[in-house]
Amino acid sequence: MLPNFAVLPPEVNSARVFAGAGSAPMLAAAAAWDDLASELHCAAMSFGSVTSGLVVGWWQGSASAAMVDAAASYIGWLSTSAAHAEGAAGLARAAVSVFEEALAATVHPAMVAANRAQVASLVASNLFGQNAPAIAALESLYECMWAQDVAAMAGYYVGASAVATQLASWLQRLQSIPGAASLDARLPSSAEAPMGVVRAVNSAIAANAAAAQTVGLVMGGSGTPIPSARYVELANALYMSGSVPGVIAQALFTPQGLYPVVVIKNLTFDSSVAQGAVILESAIRQQIAAGNNVTVFGYSQSATISSLVMANLAASADPPSPDELSFTLIGNPNNPNGGVATRFPGISFPSLGVTATGATPHNLYPTKIYTIEYDGVADFPRYPLNFVSTLNAIAGTYYVHSNYFILTPEQIDAAVPLTNTVGPTMTQYYIIRTENLPLLEPLRSVPIVGNPLANLVQPNLKVIVNLGYGDPAYGYSTSPPNVATPFGLFPEVSPVVIADALVAGTQQGIGDFAYDVSHLELPLPADGSTMPSTAPGSGTPVPPLSIDSLIDDLQVANRNLANTISKVAATSYATVLPTADIANAALTIVPSYNIHLFLEGIQQALKGDPMGLVNAVGYPLAADVALFTAAGGLQLLIIISAGRTIANDISAIVP
């Protein structure tokens, strides 16, 4: 069963932790294992004492020596089994410690209930919004409780999983004891054994061989902590099965929080990635320890998690081999040449909980990275001073980044392989071309004339957008895909090439516009046949009014109105926090980043490179264009989301 605590409110998580049996069963299990270990130690000592007494006493000769040799294996078996039992007791106590830590970190259910009761009381009396500040404070505290419970449960899940990976069944423990091998050597050979035993042994061998399978760990993107069965099926069919035939795909929980994009009060990106990396690494090691190979699927945030885990595993004392582990990543923010985290290396926004991590390692494990052209997360312009290109990428985060699972197998098979890598690499890079610019999608939504107008300007606009990537013919950087490439100032493109592309674009745009206009499909006028009948006596008869029903309706309307006002107020003030955090980042981190870039340019100039002075001025400007455009886009998404929520709340009370 997948853990789903990240999407559960504190009422559920707190109740689960405090209402359970607690640590008593594990303490009892630890005591039982200790008793078993003590009995096994006593049995080993007693058996050893008896056999040694016989040898030292009156039993001498070759038979005595043979007995001592045979008994030694049993004594070793008993002693080693006792040690295993002691280890199991220690692990049970470790599980108790993990649970007690989680219990201490979990909010008590009484505190959660008190918070909800206070909110309900304030909402009931909030007819004119006078309780909005108090409700906001309580809601903020409630969200802190939510985050605290999720963090506690995530820590418990990771700790308990780590303990579970060290546990083995008692039968496995017995089979791993060295003395057991010598005992097995005394069993009859297959020629001497009954045919039924031989068949059973052969079946066991075949089963063990079949157990060496490839397990696919499928993670969701931001806002999808638990991938659905359909999500896992598509990830396998579209991306995984082509490179790893026969993979057994299964969902893997990771928190996937992204404040304030997913939910305004939610886990930050950095916290979510850190927890997800621990969970993924534990799951990989657990599968490899079970004798399975592993292939990992990561999308968006989980591609960042995969990138971190690659480096962590490769640097560990016991790294998996490339034959045991592989990765498939889509919409990767850490794409070496195009990922938004790689375009702005090292930048961090503490108020938003977002830090740009390094590029995905390209020569540690077999990896495939798929990127849709103009995806602003995985295919950010190399030259963001081109405002049109940057704005198109921001639109791409909304219109393109979510399209990876609606592609057809034919589109993925037609992806362009980027083969101009540098040096040895285990990673294959693919670009999936996009027909239309995301920037023009709002225009295309205009009825009748939207598509013709968009097709009129798109060819020339695409030339301008593509210049932000370095080549007017491509909406992605054509430099080596496995080299971490930060943003730059100006592309090295001949003006003649640009002029030729614009001339060709003008001709294409006029031709496309003329074709669209000549094939317009105008809506048909209504014939009136669907108009409702207004004839006398038609329709459902209206029930007679009564005083009781009228009062009941007024009470319901009053309650609905109060609840709606409260919800609208809560949504409105909830947008203030992310707005303040975005402003905080814009007023503190962005200027600091500009100074850092300026000093880098000055340092470059002092070392004799005259371009350093240009970079000292140009790099901060380019960064500002990208970062302030992204901040504006993020704020717009927050406002749109809040507006939709408010509209839905209001429409609920309007008949």
From Swiss-Prot:
For the PE-PPE domain, which residue ranges apply?
Answer: 245-469
What is the protein named? Uncharacterized PPE family protein PPE28
Q: Which family does it belong to?
A: Belongs to the mycobacterial PPE family.
- GO BP terms: response to host immune response
Task: Enumerate the PANTHER family for this protein.
Answer: GLUTAMINE-RICH PROTEIN 2
Q: Which domain of life is it from?
A: Bacteria
